[in-house]
Amino acid sequence: MSDSADPGRSVSGGIADLRPLTRMKNQKAWYWYDWANSAYVTTIATVLFAPYIINIAERAAVDDRISLLGISVAPGSLPSYLVTFSTILSAFLLPPLGALADRTKNKKGLLAFFAWTGAAFAALIFFATGDNWQIGAIGLIGGNICLGASAVVNDAILPLISEEHDRDRVSSRGWAWGYLGGGILLAINLAVVTVLPFGLSTESAARVSMLSAAVWWAAFTFIPYLKLSDFPPVHVVPESGGIIRQSFGQLADTLKDLRNYPVALTFLVAYLFFNDGIQTVIASSSTYGSEQLGFSDDVLIITILLVQFVAFFGALTFGRLAKVYGAKRVILAGLVVWMAIVTAALFLPEEKMIPFLALGVAIGIVLGGTQALARSYFSLLIPRGKEAEYFSFYHAMDRGTSWFGTLTFGLVYQFTGSYRPAIFALIAFFALGGLLLLRVDTAKGIRDAGNDVPAVI
């Protein structure tokens, strides 16, 4: 082989390792996908879709009921049903997708396919007008499923573009970019919905804002699609048949092989508990703020934006702390803060804006950091060549059990009639997650997976 054919050699024949430069180029491109998809998460899934689709469904309701797949439901319950349906469907679809992604060289193409398909579904919501809530429902379900599929591929790329010792930094920076991008577009869209420029009605402003999130998601996905490298499959289990049959064969082999990675499984269970607690706090915070503490929509909007932008700095800070103390210790510290947050929420005074905003700052600090480090920490515990498969389990199990926290919140409220004990009850998820995480032997898990043990774990 000639020197010029080897990317690790200079033209003069001397050895020049170009891999760090390639990794840096890929990392910069990879960050943009978190920036891209967070617009959908914040503007559509978190803030605007639910009140918009409820309003549309109320027009179509007969005796305050609509028919969803033959089931009579109240319009106010429609967003919850749609999210639940898409979540359960994702839990079944993601594992075979992971096996397919591991066998695919063009992972950036697969990432872009799911992103652009998801953005197309999201754009359908723009056409949900009058009493046609069904097209909005299809848009959200398709968008959510494609978002989960793209997250599997995106997370699986993380171990391919970063070495073990640098993974926490890279993952945290990606999360930070996501919060910044999602926060910027959300601020613009909330201004549009509030100010109503160009004579827009509130409904039209919401439609335009959600369409902008779909366009944002699709447009910024071009950056990773064009600039990420290809990653040829490694350690692929030989299987007969076409790519789909091979993927299912590999998935079956991986399911049998899971028992060989007990440390990764223990962490997964820990993650399911504490992440469910995090997601439930986020999902219920608006309800808690409005129904229990008596805050107006304006205060809730300010708090949502505050959390978004504080989370940008929180994710970066957690990445730096992990470099010094190790991801596991920093995640555990974050869970202690989460327990303090739900405890403080129990005693938060009504209609006192400053304490509520202070709680939002605390949430922002630990929100992005704990999730970003969970992603990078898990990547150390999984074998090379099966990154997408294991991240598909990571996301599928998350979706399959994500109703535990909301069920707990709902049941405690039903029995007590107050949201204060309901929010405090979530402390159990952080405590159980932390106790299980304490049992994770990081060094052993990394060695079992065949990865290099970083100097700081």
Language-model-derived ranges and their functions:
Residues 43-76, 283-300:
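Short amphipathic helix-loop junctions that connect adjacent transmembrane helices
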Residues 121, 132-150, 354-369:
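Hydrophobic core of transmembrane alpha-helices in multi-pass small-molecule transporters
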Residues 69-75, 192-215, 411-430:
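A membrane-interface helix-boundary motif in multi-pass transporters
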Residues 9-28, 229-268, 456-457:
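Juxtamembrane intracellular "pre-TM" segments in multi-pass secondary transporters
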Residues 171-193, 395-405:
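Glycine-rich segments within core transmembrane alpha-helices of 12-TM secondary carriers
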Residues 92-106, 313-327, 413:
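Helix-to-loop junctions at the C-terminal end of transmembrane segments
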Residues 328-371:
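C-terminal transmembrane helical hairpin of 12-TM major facilitator-type secondary transporters
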Residues 112-131, 336-350:
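C-terminal ends and interior cores of transmembrane alpha-helices
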